[in-house]
Curated annotation (Swiss-Prot):
Disruption phenotype: Dispensable. Disruption does not affect the establishment and progression of erythrocytic infection, parasite development in the mosquito vector and pre-erythrocytic growth. One of its GO terms (molecular function) is protein-macromolecule adaptor activity. [4Fe-4S] cluster binds at C96, C164, C166. This is Iron-sulfur cluster assembly protein SufA. PANTHER family: IRON-SULFUR ASSEMBLY PROTEIN ISCA, CHLOROPLASTIC. PROSITE patterns: HESB (PS01152). It comes from the Eukaryota. It comes from Plasmodium berghei (strain Anka). GO terms for cellular component: apicoplast; chloroplast stroma. NCBIfam families: iron-sulfur cluster assembly accessory protein. Homodimer. The keyword Metal-binding applies. Pathway: Cofactor biosynthesis; iron-sulfur cluster biosynthesis.
Length: 172
């Protein structure tokens, strides 16, 4: 009887935690290797949350682009049929340091209602940022490199406390 109750409570806990994660709460509750017991947030993380809120209120850009990134985006816009390029940017678990960037082209109807939209009118380019990823992406710089090894879009993240050698994975 005790084992059945334990298994039921364990299964219910898993369902609740996965539904919280799906709803987007996991990024604010837990970041790998950052919080101590009982998910106590440290001061740096709370200051970063406040800075993100201020930037959003002031309509400031969450992410900045280098000239190389702007030139590549201009090239991509001229190559596609739809004259508005939309890229979805999010951070997900993975990589050797715990978190990794994901940047994919999407259609306008795929933008979610809680995404943060950053529009670059001069480039005819829209960046749709996943709401749970904003805290990790805030103040990043998007760069582009034509290098044969590790070429492509790269993120310069001043918030990262750890980075892997290839630059694809980070932790805050």
């Amino acid at each position: 009887m005790f084992i059945n109750i334990f298994l039921f409570l364990f299964a219910a806990t898993i369902n609740i935690s996965s539904s919280l994660r799906y709803a987007g709460f996991s990024s604010y509750i837990y970041t790998p290797n950052k919080y101590i017991n009982n998910n106590v947030m440290d001061r740096k993380f709370i200051r970063r949350l406040n800075a993100v809120d201020e930037s959003i209120k002031n309509n400031e850009h969450i992410i900045k682009l280098t000239d190389n990134a702007k030139n590549k985006i201009k090239q991509l816009v001229t190559e596609i049929e739809d004259k508005n390029l939309i890229l979805k940017l999010c951070v997900e678990n993975g990589g050797c340091k715990g978190l990794k960037y994901k940047l994919n082209p999407i259609k306008k109807e795929d933008i979610e209602t809680d995404d943060y939209i950053q529009q670059f009118d001069e480039l005819k380019f829209i960046l749709s940022i996943d709401s749970t990823s904003v805290i990790y992406i805030y103040n990043n710089i998007l760069d582009y490199s034509n290098d044969l090894i590790n070429g492509g879009f790269k993120f310069i993240n001043p918030n990262a406390t750890k980075k892997c050698g290839c630059g694809k994975s980070f932790n805050v």
